[in-house]
């Protein structure tokens, strides 16, 4: 095999694998629906990308079934013409998760799964390993602010950190050496149907952990592990002392967050968290646990936690001036929304906070609109955008107004993406602006930042 073609190359997970093959000398190119910062960067790195579902746009060298591998994301429609062509003409066509699964067979995989927190936890775990004597490879679900990439490579370590995606049961293709499960709050009901099926999927994932490995499970998570007899089980918590790993003495001093990390047989005091947000303490406890189990020393843990800079779009402070603060977050599930808003409230307790939220998927909005409204009601001002459909067709009666009508705060409005900047121009700007969502709202972050900078 000499060539790898990606259908949906601009996705965060797909782009990491594309970079992996490109770094190893394969001829790589791909398709995506629209240009994005990720596709722009891939093109700069020498990977050809086109944006039309058109076989004529694919380089001729890729029309060789014996030499070309086709990788696609489940978000691509089944009737996509390029995907249909390759399936019908003898090519090996695989999902992104299948490729990751093959990589986890030849490397010692540290897989991070969960409804929430897996991107921050996996990125932090990778950083802890990378800056230590252990080192690692990593396929991340976000762009690390420390490395400005979602792919980390090592020429000396056989450890690979993998963000394990539960959508479409993708993580069932993986073969973890060790794993973290951060949470199992029901999501993707269009795939799973029931909360029981969703949690069962996580339980099956635990059965895939290899002999001699370990599971680090959030204490109290509704998951009954199905572990082999020689797979170790540990629990973790941000503050519950019943867990094997936990934090205590969490304090914020002059904008810096410190805690004591407890582990079996000892504790590490005065650990400073580089991204001083309370919700990241729990993620840090889990990442430190797996890193420690794989040989990272406690002093390496201390320095790694302090130097961690977070991930793009994970409670990322994009602008911080005396006049206004702009924070960008990927939150798209009610629990994530609640955590992000509470964190902003904790940090900026006396400030006027505006939230700009783009719901993601019609199905998720239909399932959770009441919970979304409850979380958004904690804001001083709410700006709702239309639902980002991604892979879905509209559902009758399901619009952002379902959420809007239930938000208790009367200071709320519904605007289109195209009208957002006009809305901001015509209204008083709050002290803190929080951008929330997993769709294409990220394309508005820079324009909003540029507008806010004109006020400073």
Swiss-Prot record:
It is found in: Cytoplasm. Gene3D superfamilies: Mur ligase, C-terminal domain (3.90.190.20), Mur-like, catalytic domain (3.40.1190.10), NAD(P)-binding Rossmann-like Domain (3.40.50.720). It comes from the Bacteria. GO terms for cellular component: cytoplasm. Disulfide bonds: none annotated. Its main location: cytoplasm. It catalyses: UDP-N-acetyl-alpha-D-muramate + L-alanine + ATP = UDP-N-acetyl-alpha-D-muramoyl-L-alanine + ADP + phosphate + H(+). It is an enzyme of class 6 (ligase). Pathway: Cell wall biogenesis; peptidoglycan biosynthesis. Keywords: ATP-binding, Cell cycle, Cell division, Cell shape, Cell wall biogenesis/degradation, Cytoplasm, Ligase, Nucleotide-binding, Peptidoglycan synthesis. Its EC number is 6.3.2.8. One of its GO terms (molecular function) is UDP-N-acetylmuramate-L-alanine ligase activity. NCBIfam families: murC (TIGR01082). Belongs to the MurCDEF family. Cell wall formation. This is UDP-N-acetylmuramate--L-alanine ligase.
